Amino acid sequence: MSEISTALSEDCPCQSGHHYADCCGKFHLRQAFPETAEQLMRSRYTAYVLKNIPYIVVTTVPSQQTLLEPRLLQEWADNTTWLGLEILKTESLTKTQSAVEFKAIFQGEECEQAHQERSIFVKIEDRWYFVDPTVSLPTMKQPCVCGSGKKFKHCCGGFL
């Protein structure tokens, strides 16, 4: 977490225009929780920039956290240089589900590259979480990963 403490007085890597301490830093230090899906998206991007993999894990929907491989996430973070984040669109899908489309710029082996994605976020007990589409997901008739009690196809699965 030493990268976090040195970043507190700097501009936030999420490019919100705020200092890290007043932006994603308060989420990383668990002084507050993101109030919107976009704030969570920005804080997760910043966590990757700062190589704060524990934050990536705890902000993934709880039912998926044990499916993540922190060692692989750490290796990926260690080998990636992030250069910028652009939020393209934020959508409120339901009262507890939102989508954030973003473009993240990173240094590739030979040139800058961009990763564009539409991520789904779900609010569980007043906290936002990322629904990770890269891990095993339930079948459409199984209960949703968010714990809503609905079938996956009628809940988060309908947005992935």
From Swiss-Prot:
Positions in coiled-coil regions? none
Q: Where is the signal peptide?
A: none
- Family matches, as InterPro entries: NTF2-like_dom_sf, SEC_C_motif, UPF0225, YchJ-like_M
Q: Which domain of life is it from?
A: Bacteria
Q: Give one Pfam hit by family name.
A: YchJ_M-like
Q: Which family does it belong to?
A: Belongs to the UPF0225 family.
Task: Give the protein's recorded name.
Answer: UPF0225 protein CGSHiEE_01665
